[in-house]
């Protein structure tokens, strides 16, 4: 279901006879017949393929322009913007994940562009933004979740699983006593946080914009009940003059911010096991140096 469908209801002259009373007591959610249909494709499926198609076009255009660019000619326009984006994410990836993981910057660029375009799809009337579906945001969150797990196993090996247990020491040996439920819950918390943050912001923005359009239409139709169609036309025109300013904030600025925040959090989660492994190696090295000093004495 589109976010707009949650807000919009069919208006008629009979619904406006009692003025604001009928408007305030209307229950659009009940009239929509909302029910869970897990195996039936939703409107988001089409918009997902549209986003992928747009990304493919943008990639093809960049490749074509880059191929035509001479080696001595500085990049300009679209090529320059893309290369600045690539450079920015490469630096961010190297700073948080290290030089060895520079190649992963391409993955984060793709995720950023995918989320950005998905968020901007809400500006197209009748098309659902993919990120307004909790399924899409949780799928993206799972990428962050499993990526964190892979990084932990890669850099910390079996020591990564120590945080999930209550450890006791017996004769200088560490023995896992029981599962630590707080740490296990804390491990799944970022998955819920990063997924719900993106989904909630995009869905709330779409619903807010739809409410504004509905407010203008309803106000003008109630203002001129004798001519419902004239009021509807004036309400649509008034909304078209005022609401674009809100589109700039909710659909453009917030879309870019949410895409960057998601990727930044994903990078942060992936970097935590790497930093933990580096800190453990540093402590081990300091302990070895201290032991050597004691042996010399």
From Swiss-Prot:
GO MF annotations in UniProt: proton-transporting ATP synthase activity, rotational mechanism
One Gene Ontology term from the biological process aspect of the record: proton motive force-driven plasma membrane ATP synthesis
Gene3D superfamilies the UniProt entry points to: ATP synthase, F0 complex, subunit A (1.20.120.220)
Main location per the UniProt record: membrane
Membrane-traversing stretches: 38-58, 77-97, 107-127, 133-153, 174-194, 202-222, 230-250, 252-272
GO cellular component, one term: proton-transporting ATP synthase complex
Function: Key component of the proton channel; it plays a direct role in the translocation of protons across the membrane.
Family under the similarity heading: Belongs to the ATPase A chain family.
Protein name as catalogued: ATP synthase subunit a
Species, as recorded: Mycoplasmoides gallisepticum (strain R(low / passage 15 / clone 2))
